Amino acid sequence: MVDMDKLINNLEVQLNSEGGSMQVFKQVTASVRNRDPPEIEYRSNMTSPTLLDANPMENPALFNDIKIEPPEELLASDFSLPQVEPVDLSFHKPKAPLQPASMLQAPIRPPKPQSSPQTLVVSTSTSDMSTSANIPTVLTPGSVLTSSQSTGSQQILHVIHTIPSVSLPNKMGGLKTIPVVVQSLPMVYTTLPADGGPAAITVPLIGGDGKNAGSVKVDPTSMSPLEIPSDSEESTIESGSSALQSLQGLQQEPAAMAQMQGEESLDLKRRRIHQCDFAGCSKVYTKSSHLKAHRRIHTGEKPYKCTWDGCSWKFARSDELTRHFRKHTGIKPFRCTDCNRSFSRSDHLSLHRRRHDTM
C-alpha cells in the first residue's frame, strides 16, 4: 500500500495543470482506496498469528502418509536394465531397498558343477538367423547328477532335481537366458558304433510307483532283451514290465498253444470214461447210453421191437427202430432242395446230394 500511495502522489504532481482531469483521477483513486481495506483485512486473516505460530510437528500422522520416492534419474535407469527378480504386486508391503546401478549391471555367474559337465544341444532359430551351439548345463547346488556307463557307446544320465537356467556363451550375443525344466526321468544317449552297424537300444523301465525300476537293453537285430540293473538304490530288476512282457509273450505263444491243446486232450480223455469191457474191444464213449447200445452188439440183445401189425422186427437201438417204422408209414422227412426228392434216412440224402455236386 505504501508503493500505491507514492504512485498516486506522483500522478497528482504531474497533473496539477489539468484541473478537470485531476478531479476525474481523484474519483478513480478514491474508489481504489476504498477497496483496499478489505484486501488488507483478507491478508491479515491469511497471516494470522495462530497459523504462523503453530508447530508443524503437532500432527505427525500427516507426514507418515507421505512416501519418499527415489529420484526420476534412478528410476529411468532401472527400465534399461534386465529384471532379475520377480515383481511383487501385493499391497501394503515394505519396499525393498534399491540396489546401486553398479550391482545390478554386474554379471551373475552360476556355480560350476563339481563333476564333468554334460552338454545339451540347443538350437535357436529366428526369422533371419538359425544357430546351433553346445551349451553347458547349469546345475544348482541341490541338484544331483548321476551317470551310469554301460557296454558299447550308451550313457544313461539321471537328473534328480530341475535345472533352473541355461547360460549362453559370450560369443552368442543378443540371446537371453532360457529357463530349462528337466523331469526326473532317465535320459538315454545312443550313438552309432564306428563300423556303422545298428547300436543297441536302452529302454528305461518305470515301476508302478513312478520310480526307476532298471532298464532293458534290446538288440535291434535279434530283439532279445537283456536286463541292466540301475544305479539307484531303491530300483529293482522287474521282468513284469510292459516292454519285456510283450517280447516274452511272443516267444511263449507256441508253448501256450501246445499247453492248451494238451489240456483239451486231457479233458476229452476224462470225459470219455465209458469204455467197453469186452475182450478185444477198445471202444470208449462219453455217455453211458451209447456204451449200453454198443454192448448190445456183443450180447445180441434187441429190446426195441416193431409194433406194426404182422411185423416182428427187433432192433438194438431206438433210432434204428424209428427208421424202420418210416417204411410202414411212408414218411420221408429228408428232402433235397435241388430236385425236391425226399428220403426217409439222412444218410441217403447225403449220398444223393453228392451226385448233384459231381454233375
Swiss-Prot record:
The keyword Transit peptide does not apply. One of its GO terms (biological process) is negative regulation of transcription by RNA polymerase II. Keywords: DNA-binding, Isopeptide bond, Metal-binding, Nucleus, Repeat, Repressor, Transcription, Transcription regulation, Ubl conjugation, Zinc, Zinc-finger. Pfam families: zf-C2H2. Sumoylation at Lys-67 represses transcriptional activity and reduces cell cycle progression into the G(1) phase. Has no effect on subcellular location. One of its GO terms (molecular function) is RNA polymerase II cis-regulatory region sequence-specific DNA binding. Residues 216-235 are annotated as: Disordered. A motif (9aaTAD) lies at residues 85-93. A zinc finger (C2H2-type) spans 274-298, 304-328, 334-356. It is found in: Nucleus. Disulfide bonds: none annotated. Ubiquitous. GO terms for cellular component: aggresome; chromatin; cytosol; nucleoplasm. The keyword Membrane does not apply. There is a cross-link at residue 67 (Glycyl lysine isopeptide (Lys-Gly) (interchain with G-Cter in SUMO)). Its main location: nucleus. SMART domains: ZnF_C2H2. The 9aaTAD motif is a transactivation domain present in a large number of yeast and animal transcription factors. In KLF8, the motif is inactive. Transcriptional repressor and activator. Binds to CACCC-boxes promoter elements. Also binds the GT-box of cyclin D1 promoter and mediates cell cycle progression at G(1) phase as a downstream target of focal adhesion kinase (FAK). Belongs to the Sp1 C2H2-type zinc-finger protein family. Interacts with corepressor CtBP2. Interacts with PIAS1, PIAS2, and PIAS4; the interaction with each ligase sumoylates KLF8. This is Krueppel-like factor 8. It comes from Homo sapiens (Human). The lineage of its organism: Eukaryota, Metazoa, Chordata, Craniata, Vertebrata.
